[in-house]
Amino acid sequence: MKRLKKTLHLSSLSLASQALSSAALAAAPVMLDQGKEWTESHRQDFYSRDQGSQVMPLPWLKALRQPDGTPFLADSLARYGYLPNPKAPAEGLPVGFTVAGTGARQMVGMTCSACHTRQIEVKGTAYRIDGGPAIVDFQAFLADLDRAVGPLTSDDAAFDAFAKQILGANPPPGARDALLAAVKEWYEPYHTLIERALPKDTWGPARLDAVSMIFNRLTGLDIGTAPPYLIPDNIKAADAPVRYPFLWNAARQNKTQWPGFAANGNDLLGLARNVGEVYGVFATFHPQKSKFHLLGMDYLKINSANFHGLGKLEDLIKKIGPPKWPWAVDKHLARKGALIFARKTDEGGCVECHGIRIKDLVLWDTPLRDVGSDSRQHAILDGQVQTGVMEGARMPFGQPLKATDGAFDVLAVAVAGSILQHFVPILGEKHDAKAAAVKPESVMTDETRQLLTAFQKPVRTQADPYPYESRVLQGIWAAAPYLHNGSVPTLEELLKPAAERVESFPVGSAYDVDKVGLAAQQTQFGSYVLKTTGCEQRDSGNSRCGHEYGTSLSAEEKRALLEYLKVL
């Protein structure tokens, strides 16, 4: 409890209560050109397409109050950086928040655009970048949701006011008690997650430890052997924050996720990446042992993942192009920058790691390199957990999970098992004992076999002990802060040696067109400042160390390279 209080005290909400003072963020933004395929109808679909996430019943969220008594949805969650959605599926929900179901069973969830829609501000004008890294404080949102629901479980007056909003002044007999039981049932796993997972040193805006939270949700809340399905000791501090990646061209990478552990290349592999994501973002998922299913598990009986919606979202993401720089460009200088970009790495160039490398007709080859940057995320990939109900579960051709096994392996088996059961009819059906003797390996196709390698830990070598993906840099101007952990505010700063980079900086929507990145003055999240560490603490999660390329270029060459990166 003490840890939760510290987390809440340090929560960025206290800072975010001053958020969005810029009128530009409330006005209609300029929608940037992101290619002919990206249309207004696609945008609206992307903003509210359900993927199976279930945060909370919609009537509850509408009735919920902040500590000062104002509705939790009063500002459409703008205090956390979420963006207004005039065409939201329910009043008060921002971009990326969804509604599924009907009536009292309507559930609010989150979808891709909550974390992958960016808005920046220059001279009083806001610019919208779809598929860009969100500038949101997700940890503050999580902590404050816990803070809002907690009193309902112990304070009669608070619960009575909440229940009246939902049930009316004269609810039928038993309705109040049933609602209280449902709230407590919701709160126990959620509070367990928040109390154990959220770190003392907050992620801050524009960053989150997504991989840890996926591991924590799945192994801590979902795979216990009986309701409430909890294995609290599996939940670890989510202390390896990264910046949200941009989505344009993501479907063309042959590997995704910052350490490059998720394979890409066909619809099933894209689905695997997205199913893992939705399990981490509030999907309801409780796999169960089943001797009547060929995989020995029933992954779909209690599973809210919307496979159709996830497929549609992947199709939408493929249509998002890199945003075009909306301000003036010195074309002559940019041409000089293009020549510098094309140099070899040891000459200050970028193309050897960040150029387009055609792998086949569909994919680009994505190099994995250790460039000396923060190593913390690799540590969490090796975490061990109790496997609970999934002990003995396996993928076709694979080894069964042990009682204690890797969180990474549990995720891989759960995701592959869910998709196989959904898409391969014989694996999704119940069978008698005779039919159950059929080996699941015998029904695998060349396509479904690829699921078996959908998640693979990156190969760590002596030369590259902590590798991360080197992405194509189209649209990189719109993705600050930089490095995988968001520890460098601008591209100009990234071209300096690590020892000379700023140690701390504010985070927000104000943009610097000259330095190409976050402006030095921010108001969106009050006085929040991200404090980084140097190379002496490479595993802190906040190290600004590494990627010392182009640092020896002349000042004129650096200006030229920055100008080119604006239009790349």
Question: Residues of each region from the PLM?
Answer:
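Intrinsically disordered, low-complexity regions enriched in polar/acidic and amide residues
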Residues: 8, 17, 383-385
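Periplasmic c-type cytochrome electron-transfer domains
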Residues: 27-568
